[in-house]
Amino acid sequence: MQNKFARTDLAAEAVGRLDKAPEGVCADTLSLHGCEVSRVVITSEAGAEALGKPMGKYLTLEMANYVTRRGQSFPDCAAALRDLLKSFEAVERAQSYLIACLGNRAVTPDAVGPLAADGIIVTRHLKSSLPQDFAAFSSVSVVRTGVLGTTGIESAQTIRSMCELVRPDCVIAVDALASGEMHRLCRNIQLCDTGISPGSGVGNDRAEISEAYLGCPVIAIGVPTVADAAALSDSADAQSLFVTPRNIDELVRSASKLIAYGIDLALHRGLGIEDIDALIE
């Protein structure tokens, strides 16, 4: 059963609920390194209103199964994520990056950002002190924003302050998302150039993290970890509930690692999977 009113952060899912793509929305699929990718481009305000998403490009890596680091499909999925990230002009032309990892490490479904941060290869300080040794690396820094309830500071405000300090060419924001379809949980990874509104998928909207607010391009990467219970039940009680798989701790760790490796491969162009293993383990 699919409830068309169930919340979703995924543009591909929102398009799939409609009989056809509305005016101002282009949707198609492609294959990349053996992985299926859904592409949605919203080109008009009418299209944005129809989908409930800002205008921009949305790319969703759709994996048939859960992907672990030791799984055979991990290298292909990481390579696909790398190429999708590099397909955004803001990423390809930048030389310095701030990876903004959102979420609450103490709440498993919301721990995607903090866990992904553990796998990001940071180099900004090394390029400053050892420029010749790290000339082949991009300048990468990471900020773990925490959540408003434990920091007292909006994530957007934290990231904006960091942008003023380190002056990145591009911000890559990593966060957990919500879906209306159980099969998408931890099997889809969405990338978009529209920024992100933390908590929007679960009805807890926070300040928007966008180019307009930060002053530099923002690419958002997210994986759905919770599903709106309205997708499973028409009961009025389900409208305020979200559900998650029983093994969500394992799934979130695996999805976060895949995101981190995809970012590392995209930003540090000379590295391979084994190189990243050696640097972060």
Pin down the residues of each PLM region.
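A structural signal for small-residue-enriched, beta-sheet-centric alpha/beta enzyme cores
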Residues: V143-R144, Q157, A173-E281
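An N-terminal, well-structured beta->alpha segment
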Residues: A46-V91
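A structural-propensity feature for long, helix-poor, extended segments
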Residues: D133-C163
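N-terminal amphipathic/basic leader segments beginning at the initiator methionine
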Residues: M1-M55
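Short glycine-rich or small-residue beta-strand-to-loop segments that form or flank ligand, phosphate
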Residues: T60-A64, S96-V107, V142-G146
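Gly/Ser/Thr-rich loops at beta-strand to alpha-helix junctions
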Residues: L102-D110, G149, A176-G180
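Glycine-rich phosphate/diphosphate-binding loop of Rossmann-like nucleotide-binding domains
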Residues: N104-S138, V142
